[in-house]
């Protein structure tokens, strides 16, 4: 009798083991799902995104753990390994480098990944498994170029300075291409009198623009891939007593400082990128993937189910008060 009871108990325990899975993975879905968020590095915009993701996770009954890779690829790989070892249901990943997508996916195993902030190559994305949530970076550049073309509609030749983010970053590439494609499609003669990578940093952009001014070259406008670099250029112009109304300076992100600069007339234009919208959409997309569903019915999703686009918005002196 004791042997029979022990045998039945062992069968029951084995059945529970199979039901729960050896990795300890949670039940998935909205309630009690476990999601790990690995951010490349924290700044004001990314903090807004993470805060919104946490708020949406709380609202949907999802457990969210946030880890900061501090711009270190090895740290981020360890985050992904942790998610795999501890049975997380999904991963949100702002990659330190979009080029590491293959390695990140390999370490995640069968855990779905929602990439954000820096977009991997399309070949690394697949419907229902590995998708990207963000804003179409080329549109930000397009909006900047449209502002410049409207401002200088009476000029046939425009001298342009461009400050770019980190080399190889998807936002750097997309925004810069959007600017150039739109400017060059206008039929005007576009002279790129200075162009370099300032890596999102205002101090770097300031120093570079000071060097540009020493060359004696003339610029009609300065287009920056983010507000931080634009504000660095503003500072350089003020120290050189340059009339900012005669040379519009443009950024992206509509940060608090960027919007304040537009109100003062120091910056001319920026593009609002909704960190809160991206954070919410990333959680919603992750829940879809956990449930084995496509993200196609999320607002902004593409027909192939690989992307969820959160729209950019134009910001200038006429509407900047709406973004404070």
Stretch-by-stretch model annotation:
Residues 91-113, 179, 198-260:
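Hydrophobic alpha-helical
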Residues 45-62, 140-144, 170-189, 204, ...:
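Short, solvent-exposed amphipathic alpha-helices that sit
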Residues 1-34, 58-59, 63, 106-112, ...:
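Short, low-complexity disordered leader/linker segments with a strong preference
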Residues 29-31, 76, 131-158, 205-206, ...:
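Hydrophobic alpha-helical segments within soluble ligand-binding/sensing domains
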Residues 33-56, 65-78, 82, 88, ...:
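Extracytoplasmic "Venus flytrap"
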Residues 163-167, 171, 182, 277, ...:
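Hinge/cleft segment of the Venus flytrap/periplasmic-binding protein
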Residues 57-69, 159-162, 183-202:
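Short beta-strand elements in bilobed, periplasmic/extracellular small-molecule ligand-binding domains
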Residues 99-139, 159, 255-263, 267-268, ...:
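Flexible loop/hinge segments that line or gate small-molecule binding clefts
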């Amino acid at each position: 009798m004791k042997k029979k009871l022990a045998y039945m108990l062992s069968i029951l325990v084995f059945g529970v083991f199979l039901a729960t899975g050896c990795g300890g993975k949670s039940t998935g879905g909205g309630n009690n799902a476990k999601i790990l968020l690995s951010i490349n590095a924290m700044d004001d915009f990314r903090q807004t995104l993470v805060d919104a993701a946490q708020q949406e996770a709380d609202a949907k009954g999802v457990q969210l753990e946030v880890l900061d890779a501090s711009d270190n690829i090895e740290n981020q790989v360890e985050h992904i390994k942790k998610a795999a070892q501890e049975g997380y249901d999904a991963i949100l990943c702002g990659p330190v480098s979009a080029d590491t997508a293959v390695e990140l996916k390999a370490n995640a195993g069968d855990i779905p990944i929602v990439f954000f902030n820096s977009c991997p190559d399309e070949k690394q994305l697949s419907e229902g498994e590995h998708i990207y949530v963000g804003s179409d970076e080329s549109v930000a550049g397009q909006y900047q170029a449209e502002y410049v073309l409207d401002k200088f509609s009476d000029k046939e030749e425009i001298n342009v300075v461009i400050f770019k983010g980190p080399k190889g970053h998807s936002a750097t590439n997309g925004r810069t291409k959007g600017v150039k494609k739109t400017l060059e499609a206008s039929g005007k003669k576009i002279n790129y009198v200075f162009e370099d990578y300032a890596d999102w940093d205002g101090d770097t952009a300031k120093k570079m623009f000071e060097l540009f001014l020493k060359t004696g070259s003339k610029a009609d406008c300065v287009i920056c891939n983010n507000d931080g670099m634009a504000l660095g250029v503003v500072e350089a112009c003020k120290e050189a007593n340059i009339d900012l109304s005669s040379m519009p300076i443009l950024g992206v992100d509509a940060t608090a400082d960027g919007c304040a600069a537009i109100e003062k007339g120091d910056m001319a234009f920026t593009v609002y990128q909704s960190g809160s919208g991206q954070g919410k959409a990333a959680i919603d997309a992750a829940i879809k993937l956990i449930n084995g569903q496509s993200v196609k019915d999320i607002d902004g999703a593409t027909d192939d189910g690989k992307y969820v686009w959160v729209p950019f918005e134009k910001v200038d002196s006429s509407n900047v008060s709406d973004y404070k």
